Structures are given as C-alpha cells and as structure tokens.
Amino acid sequence: MEQTFFMIKPDGVKRGFIGEVISRIERRGFSIDRLEVRYADADILKRHYAELTDRPFFPTLVDYMTSGPVIIGVISGEEVISTWRTMMGSTNPKDALPGTIRGDFAQAPSPNQATCNIVHGSDSPESATREIAIWFNN
C-alpha cells in the first residue's frame, strides 16, 4: 500500500474547500491516515520547497503559504501518488482540466504566478517520505 503527503493550501482553506477536497479523497477510496491543521513558517517551507529557495518567486511563495492555516495529511491506497496528482490537476490553474480540484476551484492570481492552486501532493515515493518527515516529525 502506497502513501503520500497532501496539503490543502491557504487559499483552499480560506475559500472553504476543505470538505470538498477530503470528500474527493474518500470517494476515490483512499484512506486518510493523518490529518492536521497547521500554520506553516519560513523554516518548514524552506525544507519543503528546498529546490525552490533560490528562485526569485520564493519570497512570494512563503508569503502565500504563511497567509493562513493549511491542512496537512497522509493518504494511502493503490497508486495513490499518481492518482492524487491526477485528481489535483495541472500545477498552473490555467492549464488544469475541469473535473480536477485545480480545474474546478483554483484561481491564478496573475498571468505569471500559479501559486494559489488549492492543493499539494508529493510527486514520488521519495518526495512523499521526505515531506511526511518534514511536516509530521517536525
């Protein structure tokens, strides 16, 4: 049984999509193994987004991710990583297809910024292990 880390980002929480996201996870047949409300800080975000810390948009990303609470969790099921990523939709809300979480709900704040995209999910088993450790063993 595969596990992955997921997050409902501040825009998803503020706009009231917690129940919708959780319902989609449950309807797909995945188990929710852990679920917590957190406030992210710059330190945990630097570890979570380690590959992005040198990018010019990183301070904006930190501002966005610390703008309100996030819901973090661990879900499990067969092929949960790839299936959850498909359910989320494209990272850029403008490219996300209808029927995906981002396609149905996300809003890009400007043409050059795609950070307000409702949810996050690990992209590989290695990322899932790393992200679960960062957020739950912190």
Swiss-Prot record:
Q: What is its EC number?
A: 2.7.4.6
Entry's Gene Ontology cellular component terms: cytoplasm
Q: Which domain of life is it from?
A: Bacteria
Q: Which cofactor does it need?
A: Mg(2+)
Q: Where is the active site?
A: 120
Instruction: List localization entries.
Output: Cytoplasm
Q: Which reaction does it catalyse?
A: a 2'-deoxyribonucleoside 5'-diphosphate + ATP = a 2'-deoxyribonucleoside 5'-triphosphate + ADP; a ribonucleoside 5'-diphosphate + ATP = a ribonucleoside 5'-triphosphate + ADP
Give a GO biological-process term.
CTP biosynthetic process
Which top EC class applies here? transferase
Could you list this entry's UniProt keywords, alphabetically sorted. ATP-binding, Cytoplasm, Kinase, Magnesium, Metal-binding, Nucleotide metabolism, Nucleotide-binding, Phosphoprotein, Transferase
> Example GO molecular function term?
nucleoside diphosphate kinase activity
> Which residues are listed for ATP binding in this entry?
9, 57, 85, 91, 102, 112
- Coiled-coil regions, chain positions: none
* Assembly and oligomerization: Homotetramer.
Tell me which family the UniProt entry assigns to this protein: Belongs to the NDK family.
What is the role of the protein in this entry? Major role in the synthesis of nucleoside triphosphates other than ATP. The ATP gamma phosphate is transferred to the NDP beta phosphate via a ping-pong mechanism, using a phosphorylated active-site intermediate.
Write down what this protein is called: Nucleoside diphosphate kinase
| Taxon lineage | Bacteria, Bacillati, Bacillota, Bacilli, Lactobacillales
